[in-house]
Amino acid sequence: MISENAPSSPSSKPLLRALRGEAVWPPPVWLMRQAGRYLPEFRAMRDRADFLTRCMTPDMATELTIQPIRRYGMDGAILFSDILILPWAMGQSLEFIDGRGPVLGAIRSEADLARLDPKRVQDAVAPVRETLSRLTKELPDVTTLLGFAGSPFTVSCYMVEGGGSRDFAETRRMMQTNPALFDRLIDTLTSSTAEMLCGQIEAGAEAVMLFDSWAGILPPSAFRRYVIEPTRQIVEYIRARHPKTPIIGFPRLGGIMVREYAQKTGVNTLALDTVADPAQISELVSEVRPGLTLQGNMDPMILFSGGETMIREAQAIRDAMRGKPHVFNLGHGVMQHTPPENVAALVEAVRAV
């Protein structure tokens, strides 16, 4: 256990304050994929169990979540899990293969979709809720606990393709040739994601994040239909049950569509990818969502490279957002071979006054 202190109030948690719209200085910092293979202590646990087992074993998932907090004192601890836990929980086969990534039984027909059972989800993900419950007791009092899920469109891409893809051709084909089937898949994921995130909040998550990693492959009309609308429905559902819980949305590579995303989804925080300029995006969305928190967005490659260039870039992003609600993060996940000392230097640079 890291902390023996009495429970703190939300006002003492810098990340939670920023996610609720406060301009905190210096900005809170956490990193996507901060619990990952770049850490030697993470690699040491890889030999003990496969990836899915680590996600679904509370002892392991708790330890993996805490590792970057213990090492760096991050302001946020994001649950160690995976966006594909949801389709697995509904009954889709899932295996993580070294060098290849996730492999799922592809959804290509009505019969394939019919084999999934959303009613299984809450029981199947009970170990995830147990992990969150344990983390509420073991994290430092100033650390905000983050839950997360994949957004419906991104999760559907993996479900239809049967894994990762360069172009998600089968997903795009289904959208065109069998839109009714694809719509049912999106609807199923939307309701199940909303319910699963509420379960995470009830288990202890203080904020949740929706990862839409492949949002940027869609043209505007499809982006509205399959990214904005499902996200809006999820936010609405969560807010009805947990009105004070901040929600972070990450429509990666959404480009100009992020303005409409910010306006219509209702997320509290807009996470930015590496190609976005935080100051420009802040100005772009200020008319439709004044006071919206932005999160991001240093290039993970700059973190990988380290040195003075990294320090200058990190502080330039930080300084450009001074006086506005901002959470420092990357524009994508920490790269596998990133030197751990670079992460330490980054956190120090962001926090330097």
Curated annotation (Swiss-Prot):
GO molecular function: uroporphyrinogen decarboxylase activity
EC number: 4.1.1.37
Location(s), subcellular: Cytoplasm
Residues the entry annotates as binding substrate: R33, Q34, A35, G36, R37, D82, Y158, S213, H332
Keyword entries, A-Z: Cytoplasm, Decarboxylase, Lyase, Porphyrin biosynthesis
Location (main, coarse): cytoplasm
Site (Transition state stabilizer) residue list: D82
Pathway info: Porphyrin-containing compound metabolism; protoporphyrin-IX biosynthesis; coproporphyrinogen-III from 5-aminolevulinate: step 4/4
Reactions the enzyme catalyzes: uroporphyrinogen III + 4 H(+) = coproporphyrinogen III + 4 CO2
Pfam family of the protein (one): URO-D
GO cellular component, one term: cytosol
Subunit structure: Homodimer.
Protein name: Uroporphyrinogen decarboxylase
Organism of derivation: Gluconobacter oxydans (strain 621H) (Gluconobacter suboxydans)
Name of the gene encoding the protein in the UniProt record: hemE
